[in-house]
């Protein structure tokens, strides 16, 4: 057995010994007729932050706080401790003359991680730290397991994700990330509400998985005896609301895609989609750059943020470039000069590109998109709108009047990663049905991410939908950029994980 294995075994034994000691304390309390979980409600007068912020008016006054005991340095007849609540920590001071010998002994028996209420007077130590001089206390919830930050379990990088509750307790920067996430979504709503958008809710379960090119999760509705899908996008329902007369709508919600997991993808993720009648994709660019800049300013205090040691400037206007021009800039190939699918396929021969279908089935649009992914994306570091995507890969977008081979669609990129996707929405029901039929052919060729036919959506378009601009932003990715987080797992409280056992 190696020294490392011996150390791990010793740590495991010590950890288990601590668990046994805590359980014994719990049993001892029960034997004394005390229940450490009997408290149902706590009346606290202040939080740690309120006491620190209002020290001058609270000095020498009695307060009651509650929280988790996170450090304890009590020896002999006096000592200090730290208690943590949602807002931070505050130091505690206890002295035998104030509480008596038996009560001090009881306090010393508390473990790190226990929840307690503390009553005492506010003062400052000689070093200037705002503290509470304890006059009374009560155990309100016993921690039966020690926090694992000093034990081998935390060396497993997955433990932070599997046991996020522990991660949040011991890592202040993790708590800060998720507080920022909350604020990002708050200011997203604030921005749109101020522009007279209304927030709505659309179905998570649907008989058709539409609105995006993705593989869905399938489930079965027993009462109706039909297969249903977890939504992959909110788009088609939101556009039905535009048809119904809701001229500005948005939804922030979960989407589900039955695909791979990596640092940028989680099967369950958060999107915001918004739609505005009488607007186009230029309006959506303006909304995107202004909203993201507004959120960055509110959350980070600046539109310039650091991401992986690179400064990203979100201040409008963002760079705009067409897809064709971007491919020409970074690959040297001008797709305006490519006239046929055959010519486009020749460009791929001899290159180690990953194709979603057989090369002979690829079109010029497929090859253009392939070149963009291979040569361009990684170079789009500063916020950039890539505009005018081919019709064939944009089945819900309206054609450009001056160049019908392409659509009024853009994707926003930051640090080489897609942040958002937007269109001038296709509102011609006849053309939309033709596009859906073409997508069905793509499915027959093996593209299981191609769109499904949605007859009810076609019916809605036949009722009539005004010219409309639509936008979708990946909330998780935006949070990553604004918190300098390098994995999507770092911004989702409980990311999808492979089970460690059956």
Swiss-Prot record:
GO BP annotation list: lysyl-tRNA aminoacylation
**UniProt xrefs under InterPro entries:** Aa-tRNA-synt_II, aa-tRNA-synth_II, aa-tRNA-synth_II/BPL/LPL, Lys-tRNA-ligase_II, Lys-tRNA-ligase_II_bac/euk, Lys-tRNA-ligase_II_N, Lys-tRNA-synth_II_C, NA-bd_OB-fold
| Cofactor mode of binding and number, as noted | Binds 3 Mg(2+) ions per subunit.
Name the catalysed reactions. tRNA(Lys) + L-lysine + ATP = L-lysyl-tRNA(Lys) + AMP + diphosphate
- Which residues are involved in binding Mg(2+) 1? 411, 418
Q: What class of enzyme is it?
A: ligase
Q: Where is the signal peptide?
A: none
What are the GO cellular component annotations? cytosol
Q: Where in the cell is it found?
A: Cytoplasm
Single annotated GO MF:
transferase activity
PANTHER family registered for this protein in UniProt: LYSINE--TRNA LIGASE, CHLOROPLASTIC_MITOCHONDRIAL, LYSYL-TRNA SYNTHETASE
Q: Which family does it belong to?
A: Belongs to the class-II aminoacyl-tRNA synthetase family.
Q: What is this protein called?
A: Lysine--tRNA ligase
Please give the organism: Clostridium tetani (strain Massachusetts / E88)
Name the gene behind this protein: lysS
